[in-house]
Amino acid sequence: MSNRVIIFDTTLRDGEQALAASLTVKEKLQIALALERLGVDVMEVGFPVSSPGDFESVQTIAKTIKNSRVCALSRALESDIDAAAQALSVAEQFRIHTFISTSTIHVENKLKRSFDQVLDMAVGAVKYARRFTDDVEFSCEDAGRTPIDNLCRMVEEAIKAGARTINIPDTVGYTVPSEFGGIIQTLFNRVPNIDQAVISVHCHDDLGLSVANSITAVQHGARQIECTVNGIGERAGNCSLEEIAMILSTRKGELGLETGINAKEIHRTSSLVSQLCNMPVQANKAIVGANAFTHSSGIHQDGMLKAQNTYEIMTPESIGLNRNNLNMTSRSGRHVIKHRMSELGYGEQDYDMDVLYEEFLALADKKGQVFDYDLEALAFMEAQAEDDDHFELQQLVVHSDSTEGSATATVKVAVNGETITEAATGNGPVDAAYKAVARASGCKTNITSYQLSAKGEGHNALGQVDITAKYREQNFHGVGLATDVVEASAKALIHVMNLTWRADKVADCKQRIQQNKQEFGSV
């Protein structure tokens, strides 16, 4: 048996079913091209009979993709198969994926037929799909809850009918690994023609076991895993592609299996899918979460500085990230601060480590995570009190035009103690407020991310706005909190402006240090 596991990506079919709004054809094509770069073997890109839009997107992708096989889904109905075949016909090679329910629950309650009738429908669908392509996949929907005798019969007959891939889905994410592995093993033991097809698995994450079940399945002989980028999909989602790829890569010695995935494209693909699908990746998500390669514990940070493999079983570079992060928090030791100052270009002679570390701990206790610009400001600015802000929002008044969608904001901003009043019109209240603040302060801020969340519940909830801005190749993080979202947004902007103002002051200090070094060196 081959040790190569086929990666069947269904982000654009099963994954898209979980989205609040459908993707456009252009967005689907962007994701398909990213999946091709990633190296997926097969991409299931839609359900053509479901809508003209889905038909168009399948056809467009099938025309474009060359290095992955494009697949479309169909029920065990000739009209569905016709639509799939027509949409895919523009591709040189393609796969038709047809399915029918096989569990007693589904057969009796959803299909309202006998199992023998369902078996005949499945065989007929596979034979009909073979008229269009040799590459036909058949799925036994809800296989995880199908009586094993019925499942073995269905698999054997589907292979006889011409299916070259047989998919065993845990449709409702119900099975546990030992149980699911046993199902796969039983199929290999009891289905006489099973060597004529690739056994595939499609596991859902309702109990958080989709990845574990998929790994167990390939240990028992399955050689295709159906998955999605970031694990998106119906209900609790699908098996996560990036987790499967990195498990098989990281534990290759133990599992003896491999994929054709270009792991260095994982992070880029994950970010694209998250952005286009408007589905943020949770920070603690394995492999691609923001904290996946971030270390906050002082003990862990010390180990990482001595040897990366003390606390990392894979490198961030392996998935296309530049480096890991050592979060500077109150748990960080002096060695971490010294290391970071060195990375920022400072020698021990440039600052007082005892004073810096004491001030660092005080700030970390107050705000949680300390960023590079905070650390530099602590080292080279005498005052870091929050009441010494250079910019202060004193007043904000917004008037919105509900018919045109525009808004006008008037602000009073204190700049180094002097109050300046300005007004501006924008595309909505937040845009207007930001333009007015920019006029009053004279600062242009390049905002790269904006996130709104609620603190508290009900009518007493506060709106929290978190923004990130790019300034002099550094990211600055601003936070604003208020009962009014526009006010919270303006406060977040003012926060960032004060940070960048301090950064300019630090830059002046750094320049003086460099000049002093040069003068000292020339004596």
Curated annotation (Swiss-Prot):
Enzyme class, broadest EC rank: transferase
GO CC terms, sorted: cytosol
Region annotated Regulatory domain, chain positions: 392-523
Pathway(s) the chain acts in: Amino-acid biosynthesis; L-leucine biosynthesis; L-leucine from 3-methyl-2-oxobutanoate: step 1/4
Single GO MF annotation: manganese ion binding
BP GO annotations: L-leucine biosynthetic process
Cystine pairs: none
Enzyme Commission number(s) from the entry: 2.3.3.13
Main location: cytoplasm
Protein name: 2-isopropylmalate synthase
Biological source species: Shewanella halifaxensis (strain HAW-EB4)
Gene: leuA
